[in-house]
Amino acid sequence: MKMPQTIGLVHFIGIGGIGMSGIAEVLHNLGYKVQGSDQADSANVQRLRDKGIECFVGHKAENLGDAEVVVVSTAIKKTNPELKAAREKLLPIVRRAEMLAELMRFRQAVAIGGTHGKTTTTSMVATLLEAGGLDPTVINGGIINAYGTNARMGDGEWMVVEADESDGTFLKLPADIAVVTNIDPEHLDHYGSFDKVREAFRQFVENVPFYGFGVMCTDHPEVQALVGRIEDRRVITYGENAQADVRFTNHRMAGATSEFDVVIRDRKTGSQSTISGLRLPMPGRHNVSNATAAIAVAHELGLSGEAIKKGLSSFAGVKRRFTHTGSWNGVDVFDDYGHHPVEISAVLKAARSATKGRVIAIAQPHRFTRLHDLFNEFSACFNDADTVIVAPVYAAGEDPIDGVSSDELVSRIRAGGHRDARYIEGPTAIAPIIRGLAKPGDFVVFLGAGNITQWAYALPKELAAS
C-alpha cells in the first residue's frame, strides 16, 4: 500500500537538515501538505520556502498548527517542545528513514550505502540514469551541483537514495538495488561493535527482493569478506582488482579530469564488454571507484555505453566534495567534507594527482569522540599534503576530552615524520600563512564537516583583498 494523500499536514522538526529537506521537497512535489521548523535559517530552509513550503525558525509547540503527522530525525531530542506537543496530541511520530521508505514505495529504488562515498556515488547514479532517459527521482545527502538541491522529482520509475547507516535505520529502506562502497568502523557509539556494523550491511544487501541485487566494492577487504557471506541474493562486484565483475582499468589523469576504461564481465557466460575512453571531471582513484559503482548499476538497467560515457563526462559534482571555491595568483582553493582519516587520505591523494604544485591541507577535526577513537589514523592520513594546518576541534555539541586536542594531533603528526604540520587558533591566521607559503600551481584544500566550509569560501577573497 502506498501512503495516501489523506494523511493531512506533515510537519518536519529539523526541516533544514540535509536528509530531512530532500524528503520534505519530494513529499511536497508529490502533492502532500508539508511544513516544518529548524533551529536556524539556512540555504536549505530558504530553498524550501521558495517552493511554497512554510518553514518556522525556532522550535515552539505552536509551530505544529494543524499538523497530523510529525517527522523527526535522530538528532531531535525528546525534550524538543514540538515533539513533546505532538506526543501530547497523540500524533503519529515518523522517523526520517521511515518516511524515506514510504517515498521509496512509489518507485523501484537504488539505495547507496557505505561508510564513505555515498553522496558522490548517489549523485553519479542519478546522473547516469538521467543521461539514459530514465528520469529518476533523487534524494541525496548533499547538494548536487547540477540540480542546486539535494532532491529531484522525476517522472521515471526509478528512485535513487543515499542510505545513511549511522543509526541503523537504513535497514528500513525497501531497495531493489543495494550498493555498498566500503565498510569502516564508524558509528560505534550506536552499534556498539564493528561486528554489528558488518551485520547491518549484510542485512542491507540481503533485504533486496529476489529479483534485485547488491553492487559491492571488492577493492575494500571488509566488503569483499561480506560478499562471501551474502546468502540467496545476486551480487555484482566492482573495483580495480582483476576479479571484479565491473572493473576499471587504465586510470590516468588529464589535469583534474580522470580518464579510464571499464571492463564488464558476465559471470554466467564469461563474456566481456569494454567501455573505453570514459572521462570523469574529478580527480582521484576513489572517485573513479565510485563512478564504477554507478556504471555497474546503469549497465544492469540497460543503459548503453554511449549514454554512460555522455552522462559521466557531464557530471558536475556535489557541493563540499572537492569543490573549487576560488583562485589567487595561480593558487587554487578547494572545500571538502572529508572528516574521517580514510576520506582525508583519499582527498589529498586526489589533489596530489591533479597538480604538479604543492598540496596544503587545512583541517578542522570534527567531534572530540571521533578524534579520540581514531587518533592514530588521523596522525597518519596527511602524508600527501606538503603542509598540514590544523584548526581547533569543531565540537558539534560535545564536551572536550582530556588529552584530545588539535594541538596534540599536530604533535602526533610531527612525531610520525611529517615535515610541516602547524596548529592555528582560528581562521584569521590562514590568509597570512597562505600568502607567505603558496606559489602558482599549489592547491589549498580545506577539510572538515564543521564551519570550515565558510573559511574555504572566504580565503580567496581575503587573499585578493590584501
From Swiss-Prot:
<dbReference type="InterPro" id="IPR013221">
    <property type="entry name" value="Mur_ligase_cen"/>
</dbReference>
<comment type="pathway">
    <text>Cell wall biogenesis; peptidoglycan biosynthesis.</text>
</comment>
<keyword id="KW-0133">Cell shape</keyword>
<dbReference type="InterPro" id="IPR004101">
    <property type="entry name" value="Mur_ligase_C"/>
</dbReference>
<dbReference type="InterPro" id="IPR005758">
    <property type="entry name" value="UDP-N-AcMur_Ala_ligase_MurC"/>
</dbReference>
<dbReference type="InterPro" id="IPR050061">
    <property type="entry name" value="MurCDEF_pg_biosynth"/>
</dbReference>
<keyword id="KW-0131">Cell cycle</keyword>
<comment type="similarity">
    <text>Belongs to the MurCDEF family.</text>
</comment>
<dbReference type="GO" id="GO:0071555">
    <property type="term" value="P:cell wall organization"/>
</dbReference>
<dbReference type="Pfam" id="PF02875">
    <property type="entry name" value="Mur_ligase_C"/>
</dbReference>
<dbReference type="GO" id="GO:0005737">
    <property type="term" value="C:cytoplasm"/>
</dbReference>
<dbReference type="GO" id="GO:0005524">
    <property type="term" value="F:ATP binding"/>
</dbReference>
<keyword id="KW-0132">Cell division</keyword>
<comment type="function">
    <text>Cell wall formation.</text>
</comment>
<keyword id="KW-0547">Nucleotide-binding</keyword>
<keyword id="KW-0436">Ligase</keyword>
<dbReference type="GO" id="GO:0008360">
    <property type="term" value="P:regulation of cell shape"/>
</dbReference>
<keyword id="KW-0961">Cell wall biogenesis/degradation</keyword>
<dbReference type="GO" id="GO:0008763">
    <property type="term" value="F:UDP-N-acetylmuramate-L-alanine ligase activity"/>
</dbReference>
<keyword id="KW-0573">Peptidoglycan synthesis</keyword>
<dbReference type="GO" id="GO:0051301">
    <property type="term" value="P:cell division"/>
</dbReference>
<keyword id="KW-0963">Cytoplasm</keyword>
<dbReference type="GO" id="GO:0009252">
    <property type="term" value="P:peptidoglycan biosynthetic process"/>
</dbReference>
<feature type="binding site">
    <location>
        <begin position="114"/>
        <end position="120"/>
    </location>
    <ligand>
        <name>ATP</name>
    </ligand>
</feature>
<dbReference type="InterPro" id="IPR036615">
    <property type="entry name" value="Mur_ligase_C_dom_sf"/>
</dbReference>
<dbReference type="Pfam" id="PF08245">
    <property type="entry name" value="Mur_ligase_M"/>
</dbReference>
<protein>
    <recommendedName>
        <fullName>UDP-N-acetylmuramate--L-alanine ligase</fullName>
        <ecNumber>6.3.2.8</ecNumber>
    </recommendedName>
</protein>
<keyword id="KW-0067">ATP-binding</keyword>
<dbReference type="InterPro" id="IPR036565">
    <property type="entry name" value="Mur-like_cat_sf"/>
</dbReference>
<dbReference type="Pfam" id="PF01225">
    <property type="entry name" value="Mur_ligase"/>
</dbReference>
<dbReference type="InterPro" id="IPR000713">
    <property type="entry name" value="Mur_ligase_N"/>
</dbReference>
